[in-house]
């Protein structure tokens, strides 16, 4: 073990990697952030060829509820900041927290090799470095997942990751496949610029307005009293149907699930374009057919371009197979952090939950930093708890059975699981970073 310095390698300089570095710095643990691009930012850095960010992208959680620990976003910013503001905020945090002094920029991790006592990282230029711990913060939304569609298509097909601007849709008939938040955004862009815009939806979704009673939806939700999940679903369902109306009037399928059993859509604009006839809803695709698409209800429509807003595969390509937890694009890790069979490998950012990801990364980073500090009997106690893995991360939330939802958690349950681990370990409840 003496060959490996007491130092952590954080792979990835996006919000998760920066939150991780900040936590380690607080606990006095040496670290280095290894970032393949010339600057921090992760997915918000549009200079990266794998960034999924497009011109119209905004934060889908509010600035009030989304921030690095002790570093709120500026009060004069909009409730839902633009992508360039989030990049600016991320880099400002990195400067003020001293993360640039701990960075190895423009450095790709080609391979991470475990051995007894640590990790040897081989970089893209062939150089190597040794670390006691490896923390994967390389992001969950860059490795595009694109389904094979049956049939032949005369037009162009591309993943939403490669989309940049609504100008690309001018004069075209465009179909967006997938109704996640990015798919809904891009469908709205197409509704503004394309000759014809359509969105193919496999199922109906609940649409949550970005503002409720004049405040951001997450701010409104945080101010509500704690009630059982079933009651929250019932009350909010009634409220949404009253505010949004019958979705089938707009051609949308009625949701076949309760609220929060798959991701809701935080989008006000898509309903506007549907109501004005600028966007058309289509069912799931049956097959491609030359210059058109045939849908499962028998409808055929002509299109020039198809955008696959079909999500991302989780991966850490630098890990060896025997240490790589990702199977079929997802991983089931205790607390979405810990492999059961290694005490020197951790994951941060590979989690799906409602609400702010940046705030969640701060919580995950605190737990990882504490785990790195644990020695002797404390470490043994922690590893035994991780092996037991008796954390309930859903607390009665029944998710629709899809690949996307395999790793989806109930945010309240996740926070409760962190508190449970803190109590079990005797870690100070109010310890902040």
Features from the language model and the residues they span:
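Short, surface-exposed amphipathic charged segments that create phosphate/polyanion-binding patches used
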Residues: 214
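The conserved 3'-phosphoadenosine-5'-phosphosulfate
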Residues: 378-394
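Flavin (primarily FAD) cofactor-binding/catalytic cores of flavoenzymes
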Residues: 2-56, 72-181, 188-205, 210-211, ...
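Flexible "cap/lid" subdomain of the alpha/beta-hydrolase fold that forms the substrate-access gate
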Residues: 58-62
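Basic, ligand-binding patches in group-transfer machinery
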Residues: 221
């Amino acid at each position: 073990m003496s060959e490996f310095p007491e130092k952590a390698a954080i792979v990835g300089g996006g919000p998760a990697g920066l939150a991780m570095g900040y936590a380690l710095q607080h606990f006095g643990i040496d670290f280095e952030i290894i970032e393949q691009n010339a600057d921090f930012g992760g997915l918000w850095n549009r200079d990266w060829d794998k960034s999924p960010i497009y011109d119209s992208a905004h934060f889908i959680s509010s600035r009030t509820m989304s921030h690095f620990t002790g570093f709120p976003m500026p009060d004069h910013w909009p409730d839902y900041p633009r992508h360039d503001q989030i990049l600016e905020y991320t880099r400002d945090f990195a400067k003020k927290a001293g993360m640039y002094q701990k960075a190895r920029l423009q450095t790709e991790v080609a391979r991470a090799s475990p051995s007894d006592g640590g990790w040897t990282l081989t970089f893209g230029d062939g150089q190597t470095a040794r670390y006691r711990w490896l923390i994967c913060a390389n992001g969950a939304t860059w490795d595009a997942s694109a389904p094979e569609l049956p049939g032949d298509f005369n037009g162009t097909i591309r993943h939403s990751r490669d989309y940049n601007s609504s100008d690309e849709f001018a004069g075209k008939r465009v179909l967006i496949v997938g109704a996640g938040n990015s798919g809904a955004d891009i469908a709205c862009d197409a509704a503004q610029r394309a000759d014809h815009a359509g969105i193919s939806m496999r199922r109906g979704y609940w649409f949550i307005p970005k503002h409720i009673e004049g405040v951001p939806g997450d701010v409104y939700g945080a101010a509500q009293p704690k009630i059982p999940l079933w009651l929250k679903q019932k009350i909010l369902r009634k409220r949404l149907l009253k505010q949004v109306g019958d979705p089938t009037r707009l051609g949308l399928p009625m949701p076949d699930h309760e609220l929060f059993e798959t991701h809701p859509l935080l989008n006000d604009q898509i309903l506007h374009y549907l109501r004005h006839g600028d966007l058309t809803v289509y069912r799931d695709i049956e097959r491609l057919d030359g210059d058109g698409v045939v849908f499962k209800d028998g409808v055929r429509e002509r299109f020039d371009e198809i955008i696959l807003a079909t999500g991302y595969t989780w991966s850490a390509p630098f890990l060896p197979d025997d240490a790589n937890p990702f199977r079929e694009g997802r991983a089931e890790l205790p607390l979405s952090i810990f492999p059961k069979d290694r005490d020197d490998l951790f994951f941060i950012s590979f989690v799906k939950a409602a609400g702010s990801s940046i705030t969640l990364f701060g919580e995950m980073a605190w737990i990882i930093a504490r785990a790195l500090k644990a020695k002797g009997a404390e470490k043994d106690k922690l590893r035994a708890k991780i092996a037991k893995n008796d954390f309930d991360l859903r607390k009665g939330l029944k998710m629709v059975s899809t690949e996307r939802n395999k790793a989806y958690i109930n945010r309240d349950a996740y926070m409760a699981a962190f508190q449970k681990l803190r109590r079990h370990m005797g870690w100070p409840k109010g310890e902040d970073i």
